[in-house]
């Protein structure tokens, strides 16, 4: 991948991340009067919890692309991914706490649980990809050294 393409890709990922965060804020704090009834569960899971899961699942993936994470060691990969998870959890908690300050939304611990499960699941995907990259990088370094 060329350097110019890489720079363009990272810039696009950063713009996508900002748009994504804006959309999350809009969905979490928007005042929607004409929404359909969300109380009917799908496979036993309330629809609003599914929406929370879908809404927060992309966070670590888009954030990792926007931050251009390319760790050289396993420990650094774990640390970077942990920071993504902590930031995602903080944003999810802030949205739920913030909803308590509105007169048209109610904060819910179960919404946060749905957010947490999405963040943990996608963080594990990001961690797996980064660990594979570190392993390949170590192999390439060892092969070129010999």
What would you call each of these model-derived segments?
Residues 1-66, 84:
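"…centered on the first transmembrane helix and the immediately adjacent amphipathic helix/loop
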Residues 29-30, 101-102, 129:
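Helix-loop junctions at the membrane-solvent interface of multi-pass transporters
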Residues 34-40, 92-120:
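Interfacial helix-loop-helix junctions of multi-pass membrane proteins
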Residues 45-50, 77-81, 108-112:
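Hydrophobic, aromatic-rich alpha-helical transmembrane segments
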Residues 55-71, 117-133:
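Membrane-interfacial alpha-helical segments at the cytosolic side of multi-pass membrane proteins
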Residues 71-86:
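Internal alpha-helical transmembrane segments of multi-pass membrane proteins
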Residues 137-146:
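Short, charged juxtamembrane terminal tails flanking transmembrane helices
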């Amino acid at each position: 991948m060329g350097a110019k393409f890489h720079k363009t890709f990272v810039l696009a990922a950063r713009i996508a991340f900002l748009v994504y965060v804006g959309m999350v804020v809009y969905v979490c704090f928007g005042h929607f009067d004409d929404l359909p009834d969300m109380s009917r569960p799908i496979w036993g899971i309330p629809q609003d919890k599914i929406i929370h899961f879908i809404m927060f699942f992309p966070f670590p993936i888009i954030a990792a692309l926007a931050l251009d994470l390319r760790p050289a060691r396993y420990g650094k990969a774990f640390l970077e991914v942990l920071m993504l998870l902590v930031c995602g959890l903080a944003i999810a908690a802030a949205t739920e706490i913030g909803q308590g300050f509105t007169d048209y939304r109610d904060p819910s611990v179960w919404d946060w649980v749905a957010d947490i499960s999405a963040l943990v699941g996608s963080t594990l995907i990001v961690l797996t990809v980064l660990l594979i990259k570190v392993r390949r990088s170590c192999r390439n370094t060892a092969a070129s050294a010999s």
